[in-house]
Swiss-Prot record:
Glycans are attached at N423, N616, N622. This is Mucin-20. Coiled coil: none annotated. Residues 450-656 are annotated as: Involved in oligomerization. Interacts with MET; oligomerization increases affinity for MET. Pfam families: MUC20. GO terms for molecular function: identical protein binding. Residues 173-182, 190-199, 209-218, 228-237, 247-256, 266-275, 285-294, 304-313, 323-332, 342-351, 361-370, 380-389, 613-652 have a biased composition (Low complexity). Residues 57-92, 170-403, 434-515, 583-657 are annotated as: Disordered. The gene is MUC20. Keywords: Cell membrane, Cell projection, Glycoprotein, Membrane, Repeat, Secreted, Signal. Residues 1-25 form the signal peptide. One of its GO terms (cellular component) is apical plasma membrane.
């Protein structure tokens, strides 16, 4: 009985444990789904691939329960409800929308009018350039109307730059006066003005001017030099040193009583020279009347060109009188030559000393006097100036005028502009603005991606000048459009560089009143998503029409264009273009049905820096353009056909059965060749076979015998 109770109590406790365990495990058996815990985790992640992918991770938790009851020994009971883990693979998808091949024709019309003249001594030159419509409209109409899908939302125009260059110079023609009696130099720069300077010292008085009136006289032992242009000038010297008064487009006269030459160059004037000394009297002129007489033992040389000139010499040296469209007179009583060249000016020079009197002038009137032992130099251009020196140091009065000769001190304002197009909208970013001073005959700074404007201002006049302004304008503008290529959303690398340096040379004399230039750029861009590099071809046609008396020759190529005018102006432009586009299309590797979203980053190299380029102006620019055109032409010589006359006569009639038959022909051929030669006979049979094959394709021709008739 005690043993039964001893067995009954453990059994009772065992049943009790089983009942409790069954009550707790019953709902788990019936509703297993509710006891499981499911964690859905969405983890966005950036990958190194050229795209943006979302990584989704789903994790099902594992729950383990262990229950044990040991009635007599350990009876473990373990239940693992389930462990499930889903780790999808990482996937990267990139959508690339490639636009179809397109062609952009950019037509730009440039009209240039140039006029030159110098009314009332004040030079004026106007150059105006009118550029046609903005070619950006053609590009946007082509690129932004083809496709507006969701994948092609990001449209990037790598390079769409406008290089607009304008040069505008305004010169003020004024009258100014400056005087100095101090022993230190007085420098009075002016532009297109009238200036006067006086100096009584032993040092030179220098008064350069252009298109002005100048005169120079010297009583000291040093030269008095008075160069002028398009002016009237006079120079006299009583000292032992030369008085030099060059003139151009003026009338000049020079006399010398000393042992040194009196030189009076003139052009476009009438000139005469006389010499009583032992040295030559030289009077060059052009386009004038010339005559020369010599009583000395040396030759009298009188070159003239459509001119009148006179020269006389009583000394032992030659009298040389070249003339050019000028009137000049020179007399010399000393032992040295009297040289009187003149050019379209009036000048007079007299010398009583031992040194030459030289009176060059050019379209100006200048006066200079010096009483000291040092030279008085008075060059003038486009201004009226007078200079006298009484002190020991030089008085320098330079003046400039952009009217007669365009020589400008320019300051260029360079602005680099990058135009970026996103979703067919213009975003203009101004990056760099710099000021570049410089001096050139024609300042023109066209660079790719650069808007440059060059404005020449005259230097500041001193406080002691009185200015009467006369406005002279020089305006030149040019506009260049460069379209290199386009890239779209999934193009990581795109590098385009098109440097456009331009050299331009322009002279003063422009005889063509109007010029019309029609230039265009044909840009063809081919896009293929399966290729890595897309093709880019650029063609630039050019057409130039010049109205006026100046003949113009045009040589146009794909990279180098040369324009040469016989009117004294030459321009050469060098514009190489280099473009490279790289498109990279990543491969698609789908693993599971996971949606990939997000924009794709596009890597683009920055624009190459373009240094500003200043132009070099020179007269007679020699540009060599080597253009090689290879024409592949294949000339096929037809086979030598022997003129034959064949008569066909059927000799045997054979009825063709179901399987066909044969036809025996006898040909009588009249030929200058020997048909008994196997090669000639074979050629004849081939010709006959071709003729028969055109009518009946299934014919077979065989030659039995050739007999000479």
């Amino acid at each position: 009985m005690g043993c039964l109770w001893g067995l009954a109590l453990p059994l009772f406790f065992f049943c009790w444990e089983v009942g409790v365990s069954g009550s707790s495990a019953g709902p788990s058996t019936r509703r297993a789904d509710t006891a499981m815990t499911t964690d859905d985790t969405e983890v966005p992640a950036m990958t190194l691939a050229p795209g943006h992918a979302a990584l989704e991770t789903q994790t099902l938790s594992a729950e383990t329960s262990s229950r044990a009851s040991t009635p007599a020994g350990p009876i473990p009971e373990a239940e693992t409800r389930g462990a499930k883990r889903i780790s999808p693979a990482r996937e990267t998808r990139s959508f690339t929308k490639t636009s179809p091949n397109f062609m952009v024709l950019i037509a730009t019309s440039v009209e240039t009018s140039a006029a030159s003249g110098s009314p009332e001594g004040a030079g004026m030159t106007t150059v105006q350039t009118i550029t046609g419509s903005d070619p950006r409209e053609a590009i946007f109409d082509t690129l932004c109307t083809d496709d507006s899908s969701e994948e092609a939302k990001t449209l990037t125009m790598d390079i769409l730059t406008l290089a607009h260059t304008s040069t505008e110079a305004k010169g003020l023609s004024s009258e100014s006066s400056a005087s100095s009696d101090s022993p230190h130099p007085v420098i009075t720069p002016s532009r297109a003005s009238e200036s006067s300077a006086s100096s009584d010292g032993p040092h030179p008085v220098i008064t350069p001017s252009r298109a002005s009136e100048s005169s120079a006289s010297s009583d000291g032992p040093h030269p008095v030099i008075t160069p002028s242009r398009a002016s009237e000038s006079s120079a006299s010297s009583d000292g032992p040193h030369p008085v030099i008064t060059p003139s151009r487009a003026s009338e000049s006269s020079a006399s010398s009583d000393g042992p040194h030459p009196v030189i009076t160059p003139s052009r476009a004037s009438e000139s005469s020279a006389s010499s009583d000394g032992p040295h030559p009297v030289i009077t060059p002129s052009r386009a004038s009347e010339s005559s020369a007489s010599s009583d000395g033992p040396h030759p009298v040389i009188t070159p003239s060109r459509a001119s009148e000139s006179s020269a006389s010499s009583d000394g032992p040296h030659p009298v040389i009188t070249p003339s050019r469209a000028s009137e000049s007179s020179a007399s010399s009583d000393g032992p040295h030559p009297v040289i009187t060249p003149s050019r379209a000016s009036e000048s007079s020079a007299s010398s009583d000393g031992l040194h030459p009197v030289i009176t060059p002038s050019r379209a100006s009137e200048s006066s200079a006097s010096s009483d000291g032992p040092h030279p008085v130099i008075t060059p003038s251009r486009a201004s009226e100036s007078s200079a006298s020196s009484d002190g020991p140091h030089p008085v320098i009065t330079p003046s400039w005028s952009p009217g007669s000769d365009v020589t400008l001190l320019a300051e260029a304002l360079v602005t680099v502009t990058n135009i970026e197009v996103i979703n067919c909208s213009i975003t203009e970013i101004e990056t760099t603005t710099s000021s570049i001073p410089g001096a050139s005959d024609t300042d023109l700074i066209p660079t790719e991606g650069v808007k440059a404007s060059s404005t020449s201002d005259p230097p500041a006049l001193p406080d002691s000048t009185e200015a009467k302004p006369h406005i002279t304008e020089v305006t030149a503008s040019a506009e260049t459009l460069s379209t290199a290529g386009t890239t779209e959303s999934a193009a990581p690398d795109a590098t385009v560089g098109t440097p456009l340096p331009t050299n331009s040379a322009t002279e003063r004399e422009v005889t063509a009143p109007g010029a019309t230039t029609l230039s265009g750029a044909l840009v063809t861009v081919s896009r293929n998503p399966l290729e890595e590099t897309s093709a880019l071809s650029v063609e630039t046609p050019s057409y130039v029409k010049v109205s006026g008396a100046a003949p113009v020759s045009i040589e146009a190529g794909s990279a180098v264009g040369k324009t040469t005018s016989f009117a004294g102006s030459s321009a050469s432009s060098y514009s190489p273009s280099e473009a490279a586009l790289k498109n990279f299309t990543p491969s698609e590797t789908p693993t599971m049905d996971i949606a990939t979203k997000g924009p794709f980053p596009t890597s683009r190299d920055p624009l190459p820096s373009v240094p500003p380029t200043t132009t070099n102006s020179s007269r007679g620019t020699n540009s060599t353009l080597a253009k090689i055109t290879t024409s592949a032409k294949t000339t096929m010589k037809p086979p030598t056909a022997t003129p034959t006359t064949a008569r066909t006569r059927p000799t045997t009639d054979v009825s063709a059965g179901e399987n066909g038959g044969f036809l025996l022909l006898r040909l009588s051929v009249a030929s200058p060749e020997d048909l008994t030669d196997p090669r000639v006979a074979e050629r004849l049979m081939q010709q006959l076979h071709r003729e028969l094959h055109a009518h009946a394709p299934h014919f077979q021709v065989s030659l039995l015998r050739v007999r000479r008739g």
